[in-house]
Amino acid sequence: KIGANTVEFRLGEIEHLPVADNSADIIMSNCVINLSPDKQKVYGDAFRVLKPGGRLAISDVVATAPLPDEIQQDLALLSACVGGAATIDDTERMLVKAGFQNIEIIPKDESRKLISEWVPGKSKNAGDYVVAAYIKAVKPLL
């Protein structure tokens, strides 16, 4: 809308990005990956489309401990971005498996209170398990 010719927005599934291999400088994602049932595929496809040296910049929720079944299986909590959160360790493992380097996962503990209020009556203890986080990674140079 502002006439920038160096930015492109595309609509597609996060597990199957409608972008050519090695063509993107950066991928930005805000609170979406936790909703995917196949997070490894998300990170693998992000790696595929990034140019060597390309960056992944994510803001999402991560679990600081394994989620109890009642949180994982609650549809309200799943759709509220709580029930599908991967642990910090699992997120790092998936990024490494996809091929990323220079991985940083920076939890924001101050988000716990807000997350506990997302689904009134249901997410009261969600902040005990889930926090917002900045996730950064780089596709290595060839």
Spans of features found by a protein language model:
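Class I S-adenosylmethionine-dependent transferase superfamily signal
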Residues: 31, 45-47, 95
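C-terminal lobe and adjacent flexible extensions of AdoMet/dcAdoMet transferase-like proteins
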Residues: 94-142
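A short acidic, Gly/Pro-enriched loop at the edge of an enzyme's catalytic core
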Residues: 5, 15-26
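Helix-to-beta-strand junctions that scaffold the AdoMet/dcAdoMet cofactor pocket
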Residues: 3, 35-37, 50-52
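Short, conserved SAM-binding/catalytic segment
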Residues: 1-7
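Short, glycine-/aromatic-enriched active-site segment of Class I SAM-dependent methyltransferases
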Residues: 62-82
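A short SAM/SAH-binding and catalytic strip from SAM-dependent methyltransferases
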Residues: 14, 25-38
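A short glycine-rich, Lys/Arg-flanked "PGG" loop and its adjoining helix->strand segment in the class I
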Residues: 40-55
